[in-house]
Amino acid sequence: MNRAGRWFARILILLAIVALTMAAAPLAEARGKKVPRSEGIDVSHWQGTIDWPRVAGAGKKFVFLKASEGRNYTDPTYAGNRQAAKAAGLRTGAYHFARPETVAGDAVGEAQVFVAAAKLQSGDLRPVLDIEVNGGLGVAALQAWVRTWLDEVYRLTGQRAIVYTSPNFWRTSMGDTQSIAQAGYTTLWIAHWGASSPTVPAGNWAGYGWSFWQYSSTGRVSGISGDVDLDRARTTDLAPYLVP
């Protein structure tokens, strides 16, 4: 084989290796084998003082921090926890706990409160909408509220937010709509505790599946007193979920 032929053969081998590597994780998952994941947590003021170096030492790679709730509340521990978690080597992200009331002005106002509080930077995890209460809104109104909030955050930041919810809430209060994922909000953080794998609503999130999974609300982690939410990313590569 001449030199050009040998190089061509090597390229084909490399391409085959890449293809096999990309296929390995879904295949292993389908067969019930363990796939490498990044482990993380989410916290708010309820966790009190946190020893972030110990959290990092426990193998946690990322944390979602509560930044705001409704239109009038910002978490007093957010800024300090964010700084300390980053210093300990964790990827940090911010979430907003939604308190839907009316659609247009309320959703826009909550989005603006969140963006001002979160102060997201390059390398942070993308913003998160935590939607788990309906505020008395019907399905159509709540769908409009969620879309309005997401679109306003996108307008202000250029980032398509991650959606946090539970399977039951999305089905009952959001009508199991696929419209949010189909509108480009394809990153789902699903809360499903005590399961071997999460149930994903909205037609497997319009085919995109889950990206983050909150698998326990009663976890114990070194550096934190009491219970804490435990989370898992679907992959060890968090790059697709980061602010550029």
Segments (PLM) and residue ranges:
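Bacterial N-terminal signal peptides that target proteins for export
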Residues: N2-L12
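Hydrophobic alpha-helical membrane-embedded or membrane-associated segments
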Residues: R10, L14-T21
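C-terminal region of N-terminal signal peptides and the immediate post-cleavage residues
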Residues: A19-V35
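Functionally critical loop-and-helix segments that line ligand-binding/catalytic clefts
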Residues: G32-G48, P53, S179-P244
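Substrate-binding cleft of extracellular glycoside hydrolase catalytic domains
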Residues: G32-G57, K61, L65-Q159
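Positions that flank functional sites
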Residues: G70, P100, N168-F169, R220
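Catalytic domains of cell-wall/extracellular-matrix polysaccharide-remodeling enzymes
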Residues: L125-G203
